[in-house]
Amino acid sequence: MKDLCAIYTAAGVNYIDVAAEVSIVRAAKKGIEWAKKVFKNSPGLMISISDGDDIHFRKAKFDPLRCPPNCPRPCEKVCPTSAIDNSGIKENKCYGCGRCLNSCPLNLISDYEYNLSKDDLASTLQKIKPDAVEIHTDIDRIDSFKKVVNTLKNSEIKLKNISTSCGLNQKVQKSHEPEDLLKAIWERYEILNELKIPLIWQLDGRPMSGDLAPATGRNTVNLFEKIGSDLPPGLIQLAGGTNEKTHEFLNSKNLPDGIAFGSAARKIMQPL
């Protein structure tokens, strides 16, 4: 984590988004501070939180006692954070990318939901003091979104930005139209606007798919082209399957303010 954040800082990114865990943030800050001294770049540190069940907030697990002694351990090889060893999966290193789930030849690895409680969120904010927060939400979760925003407000942490991440069809059992997403984003704007903090709207095309193929950015580009011009005031960021090829699908006369590329960047630094 420290090395990755140092490299991202050297590359000149605007924000580095990490899990809302003290140990991870501590490592990220060390990497950022080292690179700042050398390259003079100074990205903001953003933490991700959620207002409910979210595929971005999962971790992997398995019982190491069930592993055969002669296993080639493909799970270790595909893990981008080196969270897996002979003792199992280190919870504080796993960020839920899901790569290991299909790597096990015996299907011993499963995932579970992991999220901060309301009380944990308040104390974590005080410990971490991030520059920005990204709230992962769902079209149908307006009440829980209000509660998270209220926690942010009461924390009195001085944030430079608040990002809201939402997309279509994040739940398999229920699909939505772009108009539904646009309505949901405007509802969240009305809630966030009173905080007087600059906003970022993240359009999630393929939420935490783990798919790194070049064309995976088409979904978020299509979503941006449909509703981008009608979004509330704030910066627009594309995410979910985005990578170094995503900009090729964009119209040069209609560009977003930014593109997230976490999985693609990790692939370059830590090839599978």
Q: Can you say where each PLM-predicted feature lies in the sequence?
A:
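Short, well-ordered strand-loop elements centered on a beta-strand within folded domains, enriched
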Residues: 45, 89-90, 236
